[in-house]
């Protein structure tokens, strides 16, 4: 869609949609929630008890760690963990962030390499559930055992934000 945009206003709008509807929720929000969930599961694995207040404290600490000094954490933000009860049926939120990271890498490879990368992606999809996520991603040419795909995705998000600023002039 972005390639077919004819005005800077259209391009800015589309870049804004990429950030707000795709990457912020599915990459950032789910990444934060996955990190939080991992911290809670550490307590469970250690057979430690916890209360709703403990869960709120852990969520607030997660937000503070993720955003640092750049974002003011409003009172009540620590209660966000309560809004999606289905997240606690297995490790759920990280799949959004991981999937979007893999998809961003594959998209980048298709743009750079063309058909060979697209063919790898189709072969990876055809694997279905015959391999674990690491194996399927590897078949697509993405090594999720390193931080490179994550860093590349963050770099892509930065580029889209730069484009929003560029099209705002």
Please give the residue ranges for each predicted region.
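C-terminal, non-catalytic "cap/extension" segments appended to globular domains
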Residues: 1-4, 10, 30, 34, ...
């Amino acid at each position: 869609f972005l390639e077919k945009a004819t005005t800077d206003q259209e391009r800015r709008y589309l870049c804004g949609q990429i950030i707000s509807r795709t990457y912020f929720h599915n990459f950032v929000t789910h990444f934060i929630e996955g990190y939080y969930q991992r911290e809670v599961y550490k307590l469970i694995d250690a057979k430690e008890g916890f209360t709703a207040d403990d869960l709120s404290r852990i969520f607030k600490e997660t937000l503070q760690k993720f955003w640092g000094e750049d974002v003011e954490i409003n009172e009540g933000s620590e209660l966000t963990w309560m809004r999606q009860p289905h997240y606690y049926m297995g490790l759920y939120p990280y799949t959004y962030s991981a999937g979007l990271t893999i998809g961003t890498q594959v998209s980048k490879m298709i743009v750079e390499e063309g058909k060979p990368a697209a063919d790898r992606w189709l072969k990876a999809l055809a694997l279905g559930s015959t391999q674990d996520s690491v194996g399927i991603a590897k078949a697509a040419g993405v090594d999720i055992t390193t931080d490179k795909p994550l860093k590349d995705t963050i770099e892509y998000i930065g580029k889209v934000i730069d484009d929003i600023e560029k099209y705002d002039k």
